[in-house]
């Protein structure tokens, strides 16, 4: 199935049901009081994480999703039925972003998690709500409010422990093939990797971690050049980054300059991402003598002023890959997993109001005329008084 990590949709929460004007009428009761019920609340729209999904491709074909409208109220103080919620099932790791404000509405990072992305409208009030000591037969009601309408961008962020970055043809996909059961495409031309891929690395029966490979970065990626900038977001949840450096590039470019380019593009894209733990991995050491490889590696380290961890491997021959994976597994045990950033509902600016309170404090009140209804207070029929409670 095609990998789709972004989709734009429109969601419409259900409108609230209207209140109703009704009076109690039955045999021997000709002047019963008001018994108009409230409407039902509109349905909400939710995003629900499903571990059985791994792409957002379904949301490329259907772009509009709508929750159910609340039912209108009825006589006999009957409240209308609330509208049915709409649930959008998405892969684990998906977040919803408001297109117009770039506000992160919420994200689902574990199976079954549910986040509201559009709020349904509040119910309208029936005329029974307007009964007072001075207005015994109110003919007023309120309408249900509109459900929230939002344009939303769904973004899928892969959940991985280790993220790989580097220039095209640095050997990232070859490394994943060497250490896991994943089989990404490998070839001797740039941008062989067109979409991110995941591999599970098992170093011991009880120790494993997930590695994410994204398309290679090139100079100017932060301004949109190449493919990698589209997928850098998938590294945001990784706990450590592996910077793969080809010490003998096929295009005869300077490996030190290439390494500096990757670091510069990473810093331009996200300061937070650039501050993540990062290891240098020098690949293709089998293509030259050990002395030549050590000399090139030292030149790169000096150019980067690097003081962190680095490793020498040959992904094609699996030289040094086992030791690197063992070190990564040990590092995972010492590095606590980042706490999930929770988006609290109170901080999300939904556009609904608490209209069940506003109904008596300035919201539009509808007055219905009906000659069949008798007002036993003998009020003049030349107009209606609408009382607003403070």
From Swiss-Prot:
The gene is cgtA. It is found in: Cytoplasm. Disruption phenotype: Essential for growth, it cannot be disrupted. One group found this gene can be disrupted in a relA deletion strain. Another group has found that it cannot be disrupted in a relA deletion strain, in agreement with data from E.coli (RelA phosphorylates GTP to ppGpp). It comes from the Bacteria. Monomer. Interacts with SpoT (AC Q9KNM2) in a yeast 2-hybrid assay. It comes from Vibrio cholerae serotype O1 (strain ATCC 39315 / El Tor Inaba N16961). NCBIfam families: Obg_CgtA (TIGR02729), PRK12297.1 (NF008955), PRK12299.1 (NF008956). InterPro entries: G_OBG, GTP-bd, GTP-bd_Obg/CgtA, GTP1-OBG_CS, GTP1_OBG_dom, GTP1_OBG_dom_sf, OBG_GTPase, P-loop_NTPase. Keywords: Cytoplasm, GTP-binding, Hydrolase, Magnesium, Metal-binding, Nucleotide-binding. Pfam families: GTP1_OBG, MMR_HSR1. Residues 1-159 form the Obg domain. Changing residue 93 to A: Decreased intrinsic GTPase, not stimulated by 50S ribosomal subunit. Wild-type GTPase is restored. Transmembrane segments: none annotated. Its EC number is 3.6.5.-. The keyword Oxidoreductase does not apply. GTP binds at residues 166-173, 191-195, 213-216, 283-286, 314-316. It is an enzyme of class 3 (hydrolase). Mg(2+) binds at residues 173, 193. Depletion experiments lead to gene down regulation and a dramatic increase in ppGpp levels, like those seen in the stringent response. There is no change in cell morphology in depletion experiments, but cells are very sensitive to the DNA-damaging agent hydroxyurea and are very elongated. Overexpression reduces growth and leads to elongated cells. Overexpression of proteins with C-terminal deletions of 29 or 62 amino acids showed fewer elongated cells. An essential GTPase which binds GTP, GDP and possibly (p)ppGpp with moderate affinity, with high nucleotide exchange rates and a fairly low GTP hydrolysis rate. It may play a role in control of the cell cycle, stress response, ribosome biogenesis and in those bacteria that undergo differentiation, in morphogenesis control. GTPase activity is stimulated by 50S ribosomal subunits. GO terms for biological process: ribosome biogenesis. Its cofactor is Mg(2+). GO terms for cellular component: cytoplasm. This is GTPase Obg/CgtA.
């Amino acid at each position: 199935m095609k990998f789709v990590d972004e989709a734009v949709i429109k969601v419409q929460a259900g409108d609230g049901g209207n209140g109703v004007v009704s009076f109690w009428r039955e045999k021997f009761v000709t002047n019963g009081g008001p018994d108009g019920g409230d409407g039902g609340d509109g349905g909400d729209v939710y995003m629900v994480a499903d571990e059985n999904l791994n792409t957002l491709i379904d949301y490329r074909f259907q772009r509009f999703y709508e929750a159910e409208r609340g039912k209108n109220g009825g006589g006999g103080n009957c409240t209308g039925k609330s509208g049915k919620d709409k649930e959008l099932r998405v892969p684990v790791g998906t977040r919803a972003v408001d297109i117009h404000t770039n506000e992160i509405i919420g994200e689902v990072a574990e199976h079954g998690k549910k986040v509201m992305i559009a709020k349904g409208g509040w119910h309208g009030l029936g005329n029974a709500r307007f009964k007072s000591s001075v207005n015994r037969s109110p003919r007023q009601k309120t309408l249900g409010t509109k459900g929230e309408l939002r344009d939303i961008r769904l973004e899928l962020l892969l959940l991985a422990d280790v993220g790989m970055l580097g220039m095209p043809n640095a050997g990232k996909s070859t490394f994943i093939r060497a250490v896991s059961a994943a089989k990404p495409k490998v070839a001797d031309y740039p941008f062989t990797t067109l979409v991110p891929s995941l591999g599970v690395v098992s170093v011991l029966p009880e120790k494993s971690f997930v590695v994410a490979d994204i398309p290679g970065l090139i100079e100017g990626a932060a301004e949109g050049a190449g493919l990698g900038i589209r997928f850098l977001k998938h590294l945001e949840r990784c706990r450590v980054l592996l910077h793969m450096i080809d010490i003998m590039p096929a295009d005869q470019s300077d490996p030190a300059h290439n390494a500096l380019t990757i670091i510069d593009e990473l810093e331009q894209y996200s300061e937070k991402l650039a501050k993540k733990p990062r290891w240098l991995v020098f690949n293709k050491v089998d293509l030259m003598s050990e002395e030549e490889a050590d000399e090139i590696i030292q030149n790169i380290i000096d150019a980067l002023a690097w003081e962190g961890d680095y490793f020498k491997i040959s992904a094609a021959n699996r030289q040094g890959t086992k030791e690197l994976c063992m070190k990564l597994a040990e590092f995972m045990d010492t590095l606590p997993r980042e706490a999930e950033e929770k988006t609290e509902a109170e901080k999300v600016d939904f556009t609904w109001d608490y209209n069940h309170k506003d109904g008596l404090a300035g919201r539009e009140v509808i007055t219905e005329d009906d000659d069949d209804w008798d007002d036993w207070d003998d009020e003049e029929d030349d107009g209606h008084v609408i009382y607003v409670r403070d």
